[in-house]
Swiss-Prot record:
The gene is matK. It is found in: Plastid, Chloroplast. Keywords: Chloroplast, mRNA processing, Plastid, RNA-binding, tRNA processing. GO terms for biological process: mRNA processing; RNA splicing; tRNA processing. Its main location: plastid. It holds the Pfam family Intron_maturas2. This is Maturase K. One of its GO terms (molecular function) is RNA binding. GO terms for cellular component: chloroplast. Usually encoded in the trnK tRNA gene intron. Probably assists in splicing its own and other chloroplast group II introns. It comes from the Eukaryota. Belongs to the intron maturase 2 family. MatK subfamily. InterPro entries: Domain_X, Maturase_MatK, Maturase_MatK_N. It comes from Stewartia pseudocamellia (Japanese stewartia). The lineage of its organism: Eukaryota, Viridiplantae, Streptophyta, Embryophyta, Tracheophyta.
Length: 508
C-alpha cells in the first residue's frame, strides 16, 4: 500500500476520500490493465488486445462528463453498439477498461482506512486465512455438534442505485459518486443493446470486479449488523468483529434498526443468544448452522427474509432458504459434499467375570467429491461425454505433444490438490482415468493413430510422469516417512495455499 500511496499521491486527498481526480489519471487504467498485479498464477489471464489506448479511455471519460452535465442519458444508439466514430474502436473494450479503473479508484479509500483501523491492534495477519481450505478445519470442529443448517441463497437482484448509495457514507466525494452513478446507468443501457436478455448482474469475467466489490460491500453491511446484535446478546464478544470499521452509516443503520424494533428488540436478541450458531458466506451463498430445533430455524428463515426486504431493500423469498438436518442431508459446499454422519464403534467393558459390549456412535464431519457434478463439468469442457466416457479434445490437437500432456496433467494436479480433503479417494482415480484417456485420445487424433498403437509406440510411462498424483507429491514432501505419508494421504488434507477454485471443481 505504501507503493500505491507514493505512486498515486494520495496524501492530499485521502483525508476526505477525494478520489475524483484519480479517475482522470492514465496510470490508474494502466494498473487496471495489468491483470498480473497481485493475482494468482492459477487465475485465467484475460488480457486486452493491442488496439487499446489509454488516451481514448481518457477521451471517453471526458465525453461522459460532458454528456452528464448536458443531461443526455443516451450516449450511443443501437447502431453504435460495437463501433463508434468518436472512439474508433470497439466500445465494449473501453467500457470494460473504465469499469476496472473505477474498481481500482473505489478500492483505494477502503484499503487505506482498513489499514489505518488495524494499526495498533494485535490482529494476527496470516495469509493462510485467505485459503479456501481454511474454513474446512473450522467446520470439522464445529459441525459435528450441530443439528440443523440453513442453506441460504443470498439475494442478488440489487438495484445499482442502492449499491452506490451504500458508498455515500464511506466515500464523501460527491463528484466521483455522481460520475459512477451516471456511468453505471449508461453502461446498463448500452449493455442491454448487446445482451438484452441478461440482467444487470450478469457480467463477464472482464468487468465483474467493480460490481462484485459493490455487492460484497453491501452484503457486509447487514453482516456487520448481525455481529453487532450477536455481541449485544452475548457476554463473550466476538474477536472477529473488531475488524469491522466504525462508520457513521453502520451506526445510523443500527439506530434505525433499534428504533423500529423498540418493542421487539429483546425478542430479536434472543435469536442471537444461541451459543452454538455459526455463519459462513461463500459464492453468493451462506450457511447458518445451529444446535437448535427446526422451529427455531424456521423463525430464523422468516426473520432473514423480512430483514432483507424491509431494511436493505432486497427482494427475497422463504423458498430461497432451505432447512436441512445435518445427519440426513449433504451440503454442497465449495466443491465438496459435506455431511455429518454417525461413526459406530464397539467398546468391550470387563467387570470381574462379566464382560459387556457397549455400542457408541460418534458424529463425524465427512467430505467427499461429488463425482456426478464433476463428470458434468468435465463433459461441458469436452473431456468426456455425459456418461463419463473420455473423448478427445480437438481444439488442442494443434499444440505440441508436450503442451497437450502438460495441460491435461496440470488440470488433474489442480483438481487433485483441491480435493485432497476428500475422505474417499476413489472419485479422484476416476477423474484421473478420464483425463489420462482423453489426453491419449487427443494425441492419437493428432498423429492420426489409434490409442492402443500410440501408447504401444511411446509407452504409457509418457503420461504417468505428467499425472503425478497427490500421494506421490505428499511422499516427495516427506521423504523420510514414506510409509507414514501413505497412511496420512488416505486421510483428509487441507492446504493453506488455495485462494481460488478451479472452474471444473466449481459446480455452482
Amino acid at each position: 500500500m505504501e507503493e500505491f500511496k507514493r505512486y498515486l499521491e494520495l496524501d492530499r486527498s485521502q483525508q476526505h476520500d477525494f478520489v475524483y481526480p484519480l479517475i482522470f489519471q492514465e496510470y490508474i487504467y494502466a494498473l487496471a490493465h495489468d491483470h498480473g498485479l497481485n493475482r494468482s498464477i492459477l487465475l485465467e489471464n484475460i488480457g486486452y488486445d493491442n488496439k487499446s489506448s489509454l488516451l481514448i479511455v481518457k477521451r471517453l471519460i471526458t465525453h461522459l462528463i460532458t454528456q452528464m452535465y448536458q443531461q443526455n442519458h443516451f450516449l450511443f444508439s443501437a447502431n453504435d453498439s460495437n463501433q463508434n466514430p468518436f472512439l474508433g474502436h470497439n466500445t465494449n473494450l473501453y467500457f470494460q477498461m473504465i469499469l476496472e479503473g473505477f474498481a481500482v479508484v473505489v478500492e483505494i479509500p477502503f484499503s487505506l482506512r482498513l489499514r489505518f483501523s488495524l494499526e495498533g491492534k494485535e490482529i494476527v495477519k496470516s495469509q493462510n486465512l485467505r485459503s479456501i481450505h481454511s474454513i474446512f478445519p473450522f467446520l470439522e470442529d464445529k459441525f459435528s455438534h450441530l443439528n440443523y443448517v440453513l442453506d441460504i441463497l443470498i439475494p442478488h437482484s440489487i438495484h445499482l442505485e442502492i449499491l452506490v448509495q451504500t458508498l455515500r457514507y464511506w466515500v464523501k466525494d460527491a463528484s466521483s459518486l455522481y460520475l459512477l452513478r451516471f456511468f453505471l446507468h449508461e453502461y446498463r443501457n448500452w449493455n442491454s443493446l448487446i445482451t438484452p436478455k441478461k440482467s444487470s448482474f450478469s457480467f463477464s469475467k472482464r468487468n465483474q470486479r467493480l460490481f462484485l466489490f459493490l455487492y460484497n460491500f453491501h452484503i457486509c453491511e447487514y453482516e456487520s449488523i448481525f455481529v453487532f446484535l450477536r455481541n449485544q446478546s452475548s457476554h463473550l464478544r466476538s474477536i472477529s468483529s473488531g475488524t469491522f470499521l466504525e462508520r457513521r452509516y453502520f451506526y445510523e443503520k443500527i439506530e434505525h434498526f433499534v428504533e423500529v424494533f423498540t418493542k421487539d428488540f429483546q425478542a430479536i436478541l434472543w435469536f442471537f443468544k444461541d451459543p452454538f450458531i455459526h455463519y459462513v458466506r461463500y459464492q453468493g451463498k451462506s450457511i447458518l448452522a445451529s444446535k437448535g430445533t427446526s422451529l427455531l430455524m424456521n423463525k430464523w428463515r422468516y426473520y432473514l427474509v423480512n430483514f432483507w426486504q424491509c431494511y436493505f431493500y432486497i427482494w427475497s423469498q422463504p423458498g430461497r432458504i432451505h432447512i436441512n438436518q445435518l445427519s440426513k442431508h449433504s451440503l454442497d459446499f465449495l466443491g465438496y459434499l459435506s455431511s455429518v454422519r454417525l461413526n459406530p464403534s464397539m467398546v468391550r467393558s470387563q467387570m470381574l467375570e462379566n464382560s459387556f459390549l457397549i455400542g457408541n456412535a460418534i458424529k463425524k464431519f465427512d467430505t467427499i467429491v461429488p463425482i456426478i457434478p464433476m463428470i458434468g463439468s468435465l463433459s461441458k469442457a469436452k473431456f468426456c461425454n455425459v456418461l463419463g466416457h473420455p473423448i478427445s479434445k480437438p481444439v488442442w490437437a494443434d499444440l505440441s505433444d508436450s503442451d497437450i500432456i502438460d495441460r491435461f496433467g496440470r488440470i488433474y494436479r489442480n483438481l487433485s490438490h483441491y480435493h485432497s480433503g476428500s475422505s474417499k479417494k476413489t472419485s479422484l482415480y476416476r477423474i484421473k482415468y478420464i483425463l489420462r484417456l482423453s489426453c491419449a485420445r487427443t494425441l492419437a487424433r493428432k498423429h492420426k493413430s489409434t490409442v492402443r498403437a500410440f501408447l504401444k509406440r511411446l509407452g504409457s510411462e509418457l503420461l504417468e510422469e505428467f499425472f503425478t498424483g497427490e500421494e506421490q507429491v505428499f511422499s516427495l514432501t516427506f521423504p523420510k516417512a514414506s510409509s507414514t505419508s501413505r497412511g496420512l494421504y488416505r486421510r483428509r488434507i487441507w492446504y493453506l495455499d488455495i485462494i481460488c477454485i478451479n472452474d471444473l471443481a466449481n459446480h455452482e
